[in-house]
């Protein structure tokens, strides 16, 4: 007796759902169309309204109209994005599920003549399923080439560096992140197991910055490994067992206003290593009987600490009781304002250090000066102040360095033969408005500086972005490699990776491009909202022929979501923003910044195999939005530092504040379709990207809600890669907690291991007692949202392998 009522209720429910979906698509589609976007959503909304009405009337034409909608959507989807599974998914998921629902007999019970209409709908759904399955195996974003150059039997020797060691942040101070070890290779890497785990005990506290991160790459020399923790505790470790030998605590005092709380690495000095430092030893002025072997630790409150590498005691003959005050002669000095987060370099005579400066807080911040200190006494030998008329002018009584001069926060690199330190710089803060910048403060911004490490004199400089308004720093340690040019001559090259995706390949002797660089016109105005007051723009920007950024401008076709609903909202949001490609000016309306603030390349850099003339890297692509907020430049400084680079930043002293955020959907997912992270292999003989693969899954993308399936999508990563003579690339970095190994020849994934916390660090490898190990810090990243921890994890082959 009640069955017809039940049927009516189920049908009514379906009609309501389809009707609501139709109204959402129709209203949103009209909004999008008025902004110049696709009219598909209007058409889909109208067809769904017809389906709802026909279903309400119990007419079989409801399924015919739905089949037409499905077929049209399939054709439209392929036209927009081809056979990209993740791009197709939000276009087809809701409609596909709803189509299957309409085939349930209980939903259409009481409707006559359904035979042919069900066949039509079933056919379109089958086409959609076949398309999705096909797209899984035919990813248009991936490049599936193969590097032909074989690995030589013998590796090039590096003076002063044992094959079994990893004595510097990038293994060598040339920043190559390549090891000649090959016990672990592409055939047996699948057998790696955890060999040991060390827990440092140094965890984020309630008083720490939101940007607390664990990004350290350990160094290993002989029988000692050294790491620094997030609070810059220096720990000496037995590399064979993972047992702690000793610990030195610099007693860092932090608060939540620190924009960064991290230590990416330390520097090692051995007075007996005369082979590596033959050139710079000519400038040596001192020695130390107390600390002939020492480890230098950059401390976030503005100190450089020297510790005896054998005993763990402070080198009291260095500076003042083992440390130099990097805040000395600093203008507007305050804890965390000038913040060394990355390792510098050491030579036979000098330790060179730079640091970050708080971004976007005010126009009265510390200097980004680069300094060279006597490696034994800590005496200030030279300065290079990037904002001064005379960068080498030494500070004196009553004088300070130039405030807000461009800083160098990334790791430095060093050519021991040329005695040149290579310094990647950013822009003088505030980053997003530069109307008051002087020519002097822009001269060395966003550049690669080649500086004589013994004298501090500039050898050459190359600017990668002019008048930067997008935070497009040079963020990576440069990599030095001798490569063959087109004439077959060996050229000493430097690879300068940038946030823009440009990889500038220069002769490291003189800064001249090896791979062509072209100045191209860039946008000068915005189309929505007022033009920025008091601002000016560079008419052109440099572009390298080697570029890992997407080469096409984003369009609303590239917008994404978990469903067609949030995808529609992302398309609307995209159309409402100012965007005319890379270098679109910031605006009050809001500007899409792509590549975004994280950049295509970050501090992880790339790995260069000089023996094989190949490089591997892990570029990312995640759009951001910057929105200028008009403000009185003379307003009082009422807010403390936010402890992060995102959100609202006050930019005191200039006529705007700024809000910076990732470009996300209403569900908190990126509005740009995946992939957001890749691994790639480049042939350095041709500078061709030979292979490129998505990396990372959505497993940990919603860590506070639930764990998602480990489906490869290509997620962002922070941290670098390494490679070995065993034809293996190792990389962590991604938002899911894994360490992975890839085949350097073709990019095939060979192995992965689940990490106990986020692996936003660059791994390293070494050998001891005849066994090769791979080590990564799994400690998480505050603003990146990965699981925090304190784990140093080592992997090795089982003894029977």
Swiss-Prot record:
SUPFAM superfamilies associated with the record: Quinoprotein alcohol dehydrogenase-like
Leader peptide range in chain numbering: 1-33
Alphabetical list of Pfam families matching this protein: PQQ
CDD domains associated with the record: PQQ_mGDH
Subcellular location(s) per record: Cell inner membrane
Presence of the UniProt keyword Metal-binding in the record: no
Cofactors required: pyrroloquinoline quinone
Top-rank taxon, per record: Bacteria
EC number annotated for this UniProt entry: 1.1.99.35
Membrane topology field: Multi-pass membrane protein
Cystine pairings recorded for this chain: none
SMART domains (alphabetical): PQQ (SM00564)
Keyword Disulfide bond among UniProt keywords: no
Keywords of this entry: Cell inner membrane, Cell membrane, Membrane, Oxidoreductase, PQQ, Signal, Transmembrane, Transmembrane helix
Top enzyme class: oxidoreductase
GO molecular-function term, one example from the UniProt record: quinoprotein glucose dehydrogenase activity
Gene Ontology cellular component terms for the protein in this record: outer membrane-bounded periplasmic space; plasma membrane
InterPro entries: PQQ_b-propeller_rpt (IPR018391), PQQ_mDH (IPR017511), PQQ_rpt_dom (IPR002372), Quinoprotein_ADH-like_sf (IPR011047), Quinoprotein_DH_CS (IPR001479)
TM annotation in the entry: 39-55, 59-79, 94-108, 119-138
Subunit structure: Monomer.
Family: Belongs to the bacterial PQQ dehydrogenase family.
Misc: Acinetobacter calcoaceticus contains two different PQQ dependent enzymes with GDH activity. GDH-A prefers 2-deoxyglucose as substrate, the specific substrates for GDH-B are disaccharides.
Function: Catalyzes an exceptionally high rate of oxidation of a wide range of aldose sugars, including D-glucose, galactose, arabinose and xylose, and also the disaccharides lactose, cellobiose and maltose.
UniProt name for this protein: Quinoprotein glucose dehydrogenase A
Source species of the chain: Acinetobacter calcoaceticus
């Amino acid at each position: 007796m009640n069955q017809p009522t039940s049927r009516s209720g189920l049908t009514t429910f379906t009609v309501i759902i389809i009707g609501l979906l139709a109204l959402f698509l129709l209203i949103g589609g009209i909004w999008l169309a008025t902004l110049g976007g696709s009219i598909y959503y209007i058409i889909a909304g109208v067809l769904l309204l017809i389906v709802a009405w026909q279903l309400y009337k119990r007419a079989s034409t409801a399924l015919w109209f739905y089949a037409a909608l499905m077929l049209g959507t399939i054709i439209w989807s392929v036209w927009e994005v081809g056979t990209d599974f993740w791009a197709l998914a939000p276009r087809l998921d809701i409609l596909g599920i709803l189509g299957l629902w309409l085939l349930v007999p209980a939903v259409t019970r009481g409707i006559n003549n359904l035979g042919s209409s069900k066949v039509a709908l079933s056919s379109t759904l089958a086409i959609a399923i076949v398309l999705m399955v096909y797209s899984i195996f035919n990813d248009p974003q991936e490049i599936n080439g193969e590097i032909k150059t074989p690995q030589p039997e013998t590796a090039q020797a590096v003076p002063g560096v044992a094959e079994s060691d990893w004595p510097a942040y990038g293994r060598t101070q040339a920043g190559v992140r390549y090891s000649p070890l090959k016990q672990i290779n592409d055939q047996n890497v699948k057998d790696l197991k955890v060999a040991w785990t060390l827990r440092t005990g140094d965890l984020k506290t309630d008083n720490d910055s939101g940007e607390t991160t664990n990004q350290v790459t350990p160094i290993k020399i002989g029988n000692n490994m050294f790491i620094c923790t997030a609070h810059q505790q220096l720990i000496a470790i037995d590399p064979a067992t993972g047992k702690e030998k000793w610990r030195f605590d610099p007693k860092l005092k932090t608060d939540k206003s620190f924009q960064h709380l991290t230590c990416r690495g330390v520097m090692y000095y051995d007075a007996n290593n005369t082979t590596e430092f033959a050139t710079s030893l000519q400038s040596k002025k001192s020695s130390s009987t107390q600390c002939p072997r020492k480890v230098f630790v950059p401390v976030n409150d503005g100190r450089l600490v020297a510790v005896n590498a054998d005993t763990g005691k402070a080198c009291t003959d260095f500076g003042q009781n083992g440390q130099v005050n990097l805040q000395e002669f600093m203008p507007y000095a305050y804890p965390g304002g000038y913040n060394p987060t990355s390792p510098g370099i050491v030579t036979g005579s000098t330790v060179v250090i730079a640091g970050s400066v708080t971004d976007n807080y005010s126009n009265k911040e510390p200097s980004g000066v680069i300094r060279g200190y006597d490696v034994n006494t800590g005496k200030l030998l030279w300065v290079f102040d990037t904002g001064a008329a005379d960068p080498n002018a030494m500070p004196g009584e009553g004088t300070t360095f130039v405030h807000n001069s461009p800083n160098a926060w990334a790791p430095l690199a060093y050519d021991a033969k040329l005695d040149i330190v290579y310094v990647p710089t950013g822009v003088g803060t505030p980053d997003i408005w530069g109307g008051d910048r002087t020519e002097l403060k822009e001269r060395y911004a966003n550049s690669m500086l080649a500086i004589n490490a013994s004298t501090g004199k500039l050898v050459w400089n190359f600017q990668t972005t002019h008048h930067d308004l997008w935070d497009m720093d040079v963020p990576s340690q440069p990599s030095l490699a001798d490569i063959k040019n087109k004439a077959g001559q060996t050229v000493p090259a430097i690879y300068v990776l940038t946030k823009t995706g440009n990889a500038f390949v220069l002769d490291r002797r003189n800064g001249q491009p090896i791979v062509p660089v072209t100045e191209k016109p860039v946008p000068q105005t915005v189309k929505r909202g007022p033009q920025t007051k008091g601002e000016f723009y560079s008419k052109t920007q440099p572009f390298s022929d080697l570029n890992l950024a997407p080469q096409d401008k984003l369009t609303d076709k590239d917008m994404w979501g978990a469903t067609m609903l949030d995808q529609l909202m992302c398309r609307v949001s995209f159309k409402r923003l100012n965007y005319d490609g890379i270098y679109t000016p910031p605006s009050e309306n809001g500007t899409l910044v792509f590549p975004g603030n994280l950049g295509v390349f970050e501090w992880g850099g790339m790995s260069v195999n000089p023996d094989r003339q190949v490089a591997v890297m892990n570029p990312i692509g995640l759009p951001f939005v910057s929105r200028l907020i008009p403000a009185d430049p003379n307003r009082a400084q009422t807010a403390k530092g936010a402890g992060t680079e995102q959100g609202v930043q006050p930019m005191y002293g200039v006529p705007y504040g700024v809000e910076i955020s990732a470009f996300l959907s209403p569900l908190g997912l990126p509005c740009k379709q995946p992939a957001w992270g890749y691994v790639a292999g480049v042939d350095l003989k041709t500078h061709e990207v030979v292979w490129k693969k998505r990396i990372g899954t959505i497993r940990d993308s919603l860590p506070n809600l639930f764990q998602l399936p480990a489906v490869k999508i290509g997620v962002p990563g922070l941290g670098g890669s390494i490679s070995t003579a065993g034809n293996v690339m190792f990389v962590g970095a991604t938002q899911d907690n894994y360490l992975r190994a890839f085949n350097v020849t073709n990019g095939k994934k060979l192995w992965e291991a689940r990490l106990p916390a986020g692996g936003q660090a660059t791994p390293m490898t070494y050998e001891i007692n005849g066994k090769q190990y791979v080590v990564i810090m799994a400690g998480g990243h505050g603003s990146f949202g990965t699981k925090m921890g304190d784990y140093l994890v080592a992997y090795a082959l089982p003894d029977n392998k």
